[in-house]
Amino acid sequence: MDTPISWIKAYVPDLDCTPQEYADKMTLSGSNMESVTYLDKNLEKIVVGKIEKIEKHPDADKLIICQVNVGDETVQIVTGAPNVSEGDLVPVVLDGGRVAGGHDGGKNPEDGIKIKKGKLRGVESFGMMCSIEELGSSRDMYPEYGIYIFNKDVKPGDDAVEALGLRDAVVEFEITSNRVDCFSMIGMAREAAATFKKDFFPPVVTKTGNDEDVNDYIKVRVEDEDLCPRYTARVVKNIKLAPSPEWMQRRLSAMGIRPINNLVDITNYVMEEYGQPMHAYDLDTIANKEIVVRRAKTGDKFTTLDGEERTMDENVLMICDGEKEIGIAGIMGGENSMVTDDIKTLLFEAACFDGTNIRLSSKRIGLRTDASGKFEKGLDPENAMAAMDRACQLIEELGAGEVVGGAVDVYPNPVKQIRLPLEVDKMNALLGTDVSKEEVLEYFGRIDLGYDEATNEVIVPSFRQDLHRMADLAEEVARFYGYDNIPVTLPNGESTAGKKPFKIRVEDVCRNVAEQNGFSGGMTYSFESPKVFDKLLLAEDAKERQAIEISNPLGEDFSIMRTISLNGMLTSLSTNLAHRNKNVRLYEFGNIYIPKALPLTELPDERMQMTLGMYGECDFFTLKGVVEDMLDSLGLGGKSEYAPTAEHPFLHPGRAADVTIDGEKIAYIGQIHPEVMDNYNMKGEVYVAVIDMPTLVPKATFDRKYEGVAKFPAMKRDLSMVMKKDIFVGQLEKIFKDKGGKLLESYELFDVYEGDQIEKGYKSVAYSLTFRAKDRTLEDAEVSKIVEKILDELKKLGVELRA
């Protein structure tokens, strides 16, 4: 943001400092200075001169000899400029003076050019009359060639640099995008007044307009209020185009803006002064005297002011009349409504458009302007009408036209006032300061923050969209208290050792167990194709099909958020199989996204899943063993139960199980269904397990109880049992735990047999049971009694001891 010091002083007249002091102090208060440019650099001994007499050069047809009154003397100057006449007032650099640069737009030397008296074709010359470029300014503002001629009230001997407004400096600041208010001269002046503790005088805007009603000239309808929260319009008739006054041209030129005429310059001036872009339309070109703010239609062609035809889509907001599009909202107007020299009546527009939409639209159509750059940052809707009224005031003051009374203001949802609790103690604790409430309120008063004593709340003005919480207010205190005044203090509080969150510790254990068992970690996309549901054989009404659609997908294959984690795993296993990798074991931690309702009204439930997949030298029990290792490492050994399930259509119906703890399902495990294998172009057998981490984590524990070495001997009993094949060992182990009591130390499966010696449909299962007492040596009869209880319960399942 470029800020000419003279323009700042127009609002802060008591500002008394050098440009460098201004830049340094503003930097300390939060406005980071990038550079300081002195407009009068290398301009020395330059005064106003009046040409009293002109004579032809005796030996050169293209040179003339001028007698120039420079106040206290008359000097002779030889020049070849064709545009000077007797009586003209011109800038003159005297003998020994210095000018900024050369002619024809050449690059200015670092130290300028020193002027000395000399002879031109035999005639002495005691100085030089200057063009505007030789004074370091731009030809955009002044005539393209020749000596600059003053058209204002100056007299010989006056400081020509001062008369041209070049005794000035422009400070460039790096403004962060959250400080939208500082992308304006008023905003920077407010900051300067607060920083230097000076009074701030913003422009006094008076009521403008004749007795007519603007509604008789124009109607406005906004169809997309979300993209255009406010639209204001006023009408000016009897337009009189002319050059804008020099003070306005100088200020615009200092900002790098080329002056054009009073009408265009006023819109640019107000944009820099208020930070509010404006646009002017020729009202006579607007059909039906109606403005409609709506989205474009995809494929529409529109020619902008720069003569380029651009293709629109439905996301681009357009300004239209009763028949056609006349402007791209917030970016550039149309060639069909441009202001020409023949304009009689104009429509002024000052609006607030959605910053995100403007940024995206600008990118889509490949057009970025000064206006779009400001809108992108998110403007204050309350500023639109203030800027509009200021522009109309300048129209009247400069005699550029007659303002029609009243204004159109479409503002359906005014900005709500933001109030924040004043918490001085918390601010001091955060900053390490000891600032009183009175000091805080004094700082806030400087930047127009109000205070409601009844509620102890700070009232945030609409232009400070960056203030949302206590920490933001604390930053304002720090800025004006002075960062360099905040004492250096050591951190207080009790030092504690770092510790991972419990959830991360559980995930680390699962990850370590998987890797110890030969698994490699991977990561797949959270985006999937709806076709995945068919590949996994999910029913049409399966809850997994209720997936969130992505508004800007990379393609159909990445168009929804996944609701099941298996697709990524199976795709990875299929890729490995295609590359002939043997004995592959993979795991992944990743979220699935379960919407609470569709379309989305709130954030979805993001559930972390640990997915394991393997093929090669393995079977169902290999993967089951890995899951059991994880549960053992999480203090859940012996608490899990495995129940056969047919709930998951993508798993083999006879080789799948749900894993539960305390009756709550934490995982499922099984072999992939053969049809699903075909869908993923895989052969052989693939086994997967999916663990729901939000269910598992609360059940895990890292508390461990250690017992000393046993003092008394153990007693073992081996049981070889015959049972139907559909009885699971988990059912047997539950009976062991229930009936074995405290004396049952452990049990271990050591044999499973099916064959000729066992009746068809039956199997033999053998367990070794270990019994031990902590306080005595067990007797055989005592153990036999417990075993009898176990056998009695097993008989109820149809389990018999093998003969």
Predicted regions and their residues:
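A carboxyl-terminal module marker
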Residues: 446-449, 596-600, 605-606, 611, ...
